[in-house]
Amino acid sequence: KNMTTGEIELVAEEIVILSKAATPVFPLDDYQDVNEDVRLKNRVLDLRRPEMNQRIVTRSKISSTIRNYLDDNDFHEIETPILTKATPEGARDFILPSRVQSGKFFALPQSPQLFKQLLMMGGLDKYYQIARCFRDEDLRADRQPEFTQIDIEASFIDQEYIMEIGENMIKELVHMFCGDSLDSFPVLNWHDSMRDYGCDKPDLRIPLKLVEISELVKDEEFKVFAEPAKDNNSRVVALKIPRGNSLSRGQIDEYTKFVSKLGAKGLAYIKVNNTDDIENGLQSPILKFLNKETINSLVAELDLNNDDLLFFGAGKASVV
């Protein structure tokens, strides 16, 4: 029933064994989960599974699409040497001894950095390579000792050009292999990213932003907020967590310890139970330090809803 021909029944009249074979360690269909360690130890069998086979075919097509796209944009694919000399980079080199020159060694490239600079100096203004790279370092979630990277280099261009090349390449790949058409990518400069998200590479799938509230609290008697709000080198921000009211006091204390290790002085909060009753519908140790006008302004400015949680940060702008 799992075959394209449907569920069929055969009646055998004669069976001839042409060769004996051991029973496969696991079935080759995609209908059963198999432990990854078992799959890797029996890689030949694993690659015969339709899912794995299709992934390899798809990867091949992706590489071909990238090459066609860059070729159409007048980039030249140029291979660079694998056996090279050690250069200062971010990890240790893999070393390969030379058979011809005793006591001498080759280093496997961590990236084609040196060679692409030579190509630019040699007059090849637009270069790319789907390059194998080698880094002798501990495994990480996004890094293996041996990996492939798309290396692109161009001379006499501006930032917008290389961003456009990369964006359009991703759009073409997504359209061809996922069937989706992507909108233009959002662009953030470093200062806006640090101001709104607190890091230089935010995950924009998470719709949480730091909101500046210095103007709202600068006249408060609560010095924890008022003093940094009046300091040009400091700031006061709020972070709204939709439906975050379920966080326990213990969990909030753990977050407070975490931000304290990063240099923050603390982590004030307000739990929103009922926005229709501001006087009794909010829960926080700091409410007694804030006047009603400020609290009402916070509710309106941050568009607070029932069961939301509001965190506050106050201090030097380099920390908050």
Model regions: which residues?
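Class II aminoacyl-tRNA synthetase catalytic cores and aaRS-like
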Residues: 1-320
